[in-house]
Regions:
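Residues forming the flavin
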Residues: 1-83, 124-325
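Dinucleotide-binding Rossmann-like beta1-alpha1 core, especially the glycine-rich loop
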Residues: 64-117
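Internal alpha/beta core interface subdomains
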Residues: 96-119, 123-138, 307-308
Length: 325
C-alpha cells in the first residue's frame, strides 16, 4: 500500500495535522492509522455496568478518534501560560497566536462561544489575594468549556469533515514499526488484527500521544533515533463538595494555582478542575488504571474534582520517567 502522508494516531496532533493540510489546500493522499475506533463507535461499558470491564484489546476511553480527549472534561485553556513547553519552543507570541487559531477551529465545528474566567475582575482579585496569602500564584487563563458530551459531537464533525475531504482513516489498525531505509523513514508496518502489511509514504507523522508513549520510546531505541524523556506529572485527584469550591467555580470555572511547598520547593499546580464533574477511570497497558475528570454541559454532580500535580524532569538514575510515573 502506498500514500503520500501517513499519520500514526488519530489523537489531536494527528487530527489537526490532516485538518490543516486540507484547509491549506493540500491534495496529497493522507492516511491515518488508528488502533481504536471511530468516535461514534466508542462506548464505555462502565456507563451501563457501573464498573470497569477492562475492555480488550484497548480501553475505549483512551483509544480511538480524538484520543482520550473525547471523554475528558472538554476544556480549552486559552493562555500560553498554561500547558506544556510550546512557548519555549516557538515563543510566547507565536504560541498565543496558535492557541487562538486552534480555538477558532473548534468554534467553527460547533464549540460553545462562552469563555469563562474573563469577567468579574473584583471577584478575581479577591481570589488572587486569598491565593497570595496561602503562598500560591493564580494564573490568569480564559477557559472554553466544551463539555464531555459536546466534545464528542465536535470531534465527530471533524471526523466527518476529514472523511468528506478524502482523508482515509484505518480504524482498528495498529502501527507496529517504522520502515527505515538509509536513515530515512519511508513508511510504517500496520497490523489489522488479521494480517500485517506495509504502508509506504513520502512523509510519516508519528502522533501516538500518551497512549503510545511506551511504544514510541521502544521504536526510537530499536532504530537508534535520538529522543529525550519528557516531563512527568505525578499527583492525585481530589474530590470535594461543590460548596467548598463555590466561589472559584462561579468566578473562574477552573482555578490555575501554582505553589512551591516545603521541604523540596518543587513546582506543584492544580489542573483539570471539574465543577459538578465526575471522577473517571482510564486503563492502560499492563493493568495500569489511572483517574481522570469528566465535566458535562448538562449532567452535573454535587462535587468538584481537580488534580494536584508535581512536575518532574529527570533521567537519573533511570531514563524512563513515564514508566516510573
Amino acid at each position: 500500500m502506498e500514500t503520500d502522508v501517513v499519520i500514526v494516531g488519530a489523537g489531536p496532533a494527528g487530527i489537526f495535522t490532516a485538518l490543516e493540510m486540507r484547509k491549506r489546500g493540500s491534495r496529497q493522499r493522507i492516511l491515518i492509522v488508528e488502533k481504536g475506533l471511530a468516535v461514534e463507535d466508542r462506548r464505555c461499558p462502565k456507563n451501563i455496568t457501573g464498573r470497569c470491564v477492562n475492555c480488550k484489546p484497548y480501553c475505549y476511553i483512551t483509544t480511538g478518534f480524538s484520543g482520550a480527549g473525547a471523554f475528558s472534561d472538554g476544556k480549552l485553556s486559552l493562555s500560553y501560560e498554561v500547558g506544556g513547553d510550546l512557548p519555549s519552543l516557538i515563543g510566547e507570541r507565536k504560541a498565543q497566536e496558535t492557541i487562538d487559531y486552534t480555538d477558532s477551529i473548534y468554534l467553527s465545528f460547533g464549540a460553545d462561544g462562552t469563555v469563562e474566567g474573563i469577567n468579574n475582575s473584583e471577584a478575581v482579585k479577591e481570589i488572587r489575594r486569598r491565593a497570595i496569602r496561602a503562598g500560591l500564584k493564580l494564573v490568569d487563563c480564559p477557559i472554553r468549556h466544551l463539555g464531555t458530551e459536546k466534545a464528542q459531537d465536535i470531534y465527530y464533525a471533524i471526523e466527518q469533515y476529514l472523511l468528506e475531504h478524502d482523508v482515509e482513516i484505518l480504524f482498528g489498525h495498529a502501527c507496529t514499526n517504522l520502515i527505515l531505509e538509509n536513515g530515512v523513514c519511508r513508511g510504517v508496518i500496520v497490523d489489522s488484527g488479521k494480517t500485517t502489511f506495509d504502508v509506504k509514504a513520502k512523509h510519516v507523522v508519528v502522533a501516538t500521544g500518551r497512549r503510545g508513549a511506551d511504544w514510541l520510546e521502544s521504536i526510537c531505541a530499536e532504530h537508534g533515533i535520538a529522543h529525550q524523556p519528557g516531563t512527568v506529572d505525578i499527583g492525585v485527584r481530589v474530590e470535594v463538595r461543590n460548596e467548598v469550591m463555590e466561589t472559584v467555580n462561579e468566578v473562574l470555572y477552573e482555578s490555575k494555582l501554582i505553589g512551591y511547598p516545603q521541604p523540596f520547593r518543587n513546582k506543584v499546580r492544580t489542573f483539570c478542575q471539574n465543577p459538578g464533574g465526575f471522577v473517571s477511570q482510564e486503563n492502560y497497558d499492563n493493568d495500569l488504571a489511572v483517574v481522570n475528570g469528566h465535566a458535562y454541559k448538562e449532567k452535573k454532580s454535587p462535587n468538584t474534582n481537580l488534580a494536584i500535580l508535581c512536575s518532574h524532569n529527570f533521567n537519573v538514575p533511570f531514563d524512563q520517567p513515564i514508566a516510573y510515573a
